[in-house]
Structures are given as C-alpha cells and as structure tokens.
Amino acid sequence: LFHDTIINNVNLGDVSISNEKVEEALRDAGAWAFVESLPEGVDTVIGERGIRLSGGQRQRISIARAIVGDPELLILDEATTALDPQTEERILRTIGNLTKKGITAVAVSHQTAVLEIADQVFKLENGKFEAINN
C-alpha cells in the first residue's frame, strides 16, 4: 500500500473508476465498515505500507484494489490469513460470487475455509503438484 488516501490506494489514481465503484469494492472486501468509521473516510491517508491500519485492514484494502477493476483472473496468495473468521467468510463469499460472474480465481492458502469455495483443489507437497478430488 502507498502513503496516500484509501481511495487512491484502491483505484490507483485512475479517475475513470468512480467513487461508487470504489465503495462497492470496499464493501465486497469487508472493508467499508471500518473505512466509513474513519474521520476522513476514503480520504484518510493510511501511511507508508498502510502502517496506520491493522494487518487485516491492510489485506481488505488490497483485496478491494484487486476487485475494483472487474478482473478476469484474480490470484490470491494467503488473502484471508490475517482476518477474523467473520471477515474471512465474507471475503470468501465475495470471491465465490466473483467466480459466478465468470472471473477465474486462483487462491493459494493454508486456510481450509478456502476449500469451501473451490471448484478444484490442488496440493503441492514435496515438490509434487497433484489434483485432489473435491
């Protein structure tokens, strides 16, 4: 994350992305409640690497950034690791909804909750990659 406002961290300065689209992404990522509670809301400067936010809050902002542009492919590496169970569930539900819209999501995780939304599971062990039946 950059030493800038939340809105600029989500839209990466792309003025073609509306404030409404940023808010939708923040909601989908489970970040809207805490962003809305900040004195300056989306205009809050979060500090270098998001230092003024908790680890879970930083992750939720990063997920909002990833989904704000309606990607065709979403690659997530331990995306829910630092989140509480309720936020993790919401984000996994969001990822599941995105895949229903035709977005392919590849999630790398040690969290077993991710298995609930997976169409296909692969395991990497001892340098070998194998498909596991769901």
Feature roles, as predicted:
Residues 61, 67-68:
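Hydrophobic/aromatic position at a conserved helix-loop-beta junction
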Residues 102-108:
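Conserved H-loop
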Residues 116-123:
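Conserved catalytic segment of ABC-fold P-loop ATPases
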